[in-house]
Swiss-Prot record:
Protein's cellular compartments: Cell membrane
Name of the protein described by the UniProt record: Uncharacterized lipoprotein in oleD 5'region
Biological classification of the source: Bacteria, Bacillati, Actinomycetota, Actinomycetes, Kitasatosporales
Bilayer disposition of the protein: Lipid-anchor
Lipid attachment in record (N-palmitoyl cysteine): 19
């Protein structure tokens, strides 16, 4: 009897030991980290950091998995539904809503270290906040800037804008006119994705487009501030026809680079990270510079959708996953990731790094814009992807090509007042399938107050 009791106690102790938190029975914890880094410097920096983590954390190993921006949404959805999602997920804030509402992402608000939570500004946290939860850590972002042919600017004797004294939108139009000549355009607008580019730049002119009422419902109203950027693009292409070509309206940013290098275009509005491609591809005799985008009533304000790091709701080691994210986003490491991707870090300490304040390759110009970056206007609007594809993109494409008028755009918007909507208070919170959007302030109020 005594032998059987002793054996039973031994078995019980073994079972209890196996259930003890932080003491995995099968050896070190393994976290699967899917990265979307794609530029050579960015991939190298990310893999180096994973290697450094593994060398100093023998009990928590990280497995690097290469993902792709081209297919990340569908790939993640498939992996979530199949129970094969990575533990740590690299994505962008404008792609998180469906996953947060579907219960696929972990709420990080109770897991974030105080250092990390306080280092990233509240506005950046809002991009990854849904209801009462924080479903991603925003860490890299990029403003839209003007990449300009420095020799053309000098020859035209135009005023060179700075973050402290940018061009206004009317002045930008006049400069484009001065830079125009036979077979040469003042500016090229690559607008393969016209909606996000227009909405984000329109914040500089006081545009909002999406208006949330006291009942938390969203309506679409195309007002004076929303007209400025749209009218500028339209007029440069369809009215001042020689100032901007219609042929680039359906192009991606990279498609315009040969024309910029060859002197066909004097300026191209591009994301800040395109500088890496320019450094790698531009002829040696091509002289270029980075200029801030034009400013209006809202100053240099722009909308952005930062890159994010999230944790799968099914991850059995969430604390370890957040610890790894915290390691990746230590100030110096965040700088390494930003330099590798040619983007700006969200962290206030990382933004102070001297490497981001050099005039070389326009780093200082971009860093000066960081304080003016705000959540993209559509971040908190449910139904936005469908509205963008079915309503907004065709409307902007017709208007920019000269096939319709601003009144037509306004009329198209007027029929979509109820297309985009947040959840009602009766909806379950994010984390539960078919959940809805609630007041974003609920979660951010629990984060430390930051700039």
């Amino acid at each position: 009897m005594r032998t059987r009791i002793t054996l039973a106690l031994a078995v019980l102790l073994l079972l209890l030991a196996g259930c003890s938190p932080g003491a995995p029975a099968d050896g070190p914890v393994t976290l699967r980290f899917q990265s979307l880094a794609w530029q050579p410097d960015s991939v190298a920096a990310t893999k180096e950091l994973v290697g450094e983590w593994n060398a100093t954390h023998p009990d928590v190993k990280v497995e690097y998995i290469q993902g792709s921006w081209d297919s990340v949404h569908d790939q993640l959805l498939t992996s979530f539904e199949g129970g094969e999602a990575p533990d740590v997920i690299h994505d962008a804030s404008d792609d998180l809503a469906d996953f947060a509402y579907g219960g696929y992402l972990a709420d990080l608000s109770g897991l974030l270290p105080a250092r990390l939570a306080s280092d990233i500004p509240r506005g950046s946290w809002e991009t990854a906040t849904f209801g009462r939860g924080v479903y991603g850590v925003p860490f890299l972002q990029e403003p839209r800037v003007l990449i300009a042919d420095a020799d053309r600017l000098r020859a035209a004797k135009v005023r060179i804008p700075t973050p402290g004294h940018p061009w206004s939108w009317p002045e930008f139009r006049q400069v484009a006119k001065k830079l125009t000549g036979p077979g040469r355009y003042g500016v090229a607008w690559p607008l393969k994705e016209p909606v996000s580019a227009t909405l984000n730049l329109s914040l500089s002119a006081g545009g909002r487009l999406f208006h949330r009422g006291a009942d938390d419902k969203v309506t679409v109203r195309f007002e004076a501030g929303d007209e400025v950027v749209a009218r500028t693009i339209h007029d440069q292409v369809a009215v001042d026809r020689e100032h901007a070509p219609a042929s680039t309206l359906g192009s991606g940013g990279a498609d315009t680079l040969p024309g910029l290098f060859g002197g066909r275009y004097a300026m191209v509005p591009l994301g800040f990270s395109y500088r890496q491609q320019i450094v790698r591809q531009a002829p040696e005799d091509f002289h270029w510079q980075v200029l801030p985008a034009p400013a209006g009533a809202g100053g240099l304000t722009q909308g952005v959708s930062p890159q994010t790091l999230s944790v799968s709701a099914d991850c059995p080691h969430k604390k370890e996953a957040v610890a790894f994210i915290d390691f990746l986003l230590r100030p110096r490491n965040m700088v390494r990731l930003a330099l590798g991707d040619w983007m700006l870090p969200t962290g206030t300490q990382a933004l102070k790094d001297p490497a981001l304040h050099t005039a070389r390759h326009g780093w200082a110009t971009g860093t000066a814009l960081a304080a003016r970056l705000r959540p993209a206007p559509a971040q908190s609007v449910r139904g936005y992807p469908e509205w963008k594809d079915k309503v907004a993109t065709p409307a902007y494409q017709r208007y920019y090509s000269g096939a319709s008028t601003l009144a037509d755009v306004r009329h198209a918007w007027s029929g979509t007042a109820t297309w985009c909507w947040p959840a009602t208070s009766a909806d379950p919170p994010p984390g539960v399938p078919r959940a809805g959007k609630r007041n974003i302030r609920d979660a951010t109020s629990r984060l430390p107050s930051t700039p």
